[in-house]
Design a protein with these regions (language model features):
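Beta1/beta-strand and adjacent pyrophosphate-binding region of the FAD-binding site
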Residues: 3-13
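Conserved N-terminal/central alpha/beta ligand/cofactor-binding core
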Residues: 4, 21-132, 140
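Residue-level detector of intrinsically disordered, flexible termini
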Residues: 11, 96, 150-151
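N-terminal Rossmann-fold NAD(P) dinucleotide-binding loop
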Residues: 16
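Core beta-strand elements of the Rossmann-like FAD/NAD(P) dinucleotide-binding domain
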Residues: 142-146
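Single conserved hydrophobic/aromatic residue that forms the stacking wall/gate
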Residues: 147, 151-155
Length: 155
């Protein structure tokens, strides 16, 4: 396996999953590093997506081609409109999701994106040369390097 990437994303929370998917979908050779493949995009003890603030962010992610809204639709167990006692400007959709199905739906999406490698490990060191990040080392002594502008012809 080639351990040189255009983009390396550390952490497979919601933002890390969206970032890795976006980079890979734009054609970048991408590596997503997570400590636990069974906790990709894990939701908190309140597995809600939506509400006034997060609902706006989810709509923006959706407009940019992201996956959080799609995964929410696939794994929701309850949909509700919040703040109905207030005016329409304050109404906000929210979904409660099945936490385990949410993880598996995200994994299925990520594992089927071309250019995206998912690596289970812990990052122990960021490699910096001349003030620039050039890669990282993991707990299992795997080295992942970033392509540099000088090495663009190597691909």
């Amino acid at each position: 396996m080639d351990f040189k990437y255009d983009v390396i994303v550390i952490g497979a929370g919601h933002a890390g999953c969206e970032a890795a998917a976006a980079a890979a979908n734009l054609g970048s050779k991408t590596c997503l590093i997570t400590m636990d493949m069974n906790k990709v995009a894990q939701m908190s003890c309140n597995p809600a997506v939506g509400g006034i603030a997060k609902g706006q962010i989810v709509r923006e992610i959706d407009a940019l081609g992201g996956y959080m809204g799609l995964v929410t639709d696939q794994t929701a167990i309850q949909f509700r409109i919040l703040n109905r006692s207030k005016g329409p400007a304050m109404w906000s959709p929210r979904a409660q999701c099945d936490r385990n199905k949410f993880i598996w739906a995200w994994r299925e999406i990520l594992e089927n994106i071309p250019n995206l490698h998912i690596w289970q490990d812990t990052v122990k060191e960021i490699i910096v040369e001349n003030g620039e990040v050039v890669g990282l080392k993991t707990f299992w002594d795997v080295t992942c390097l970033l392509y540099t502008s000088d090495a663009a012809d190597e691909r």
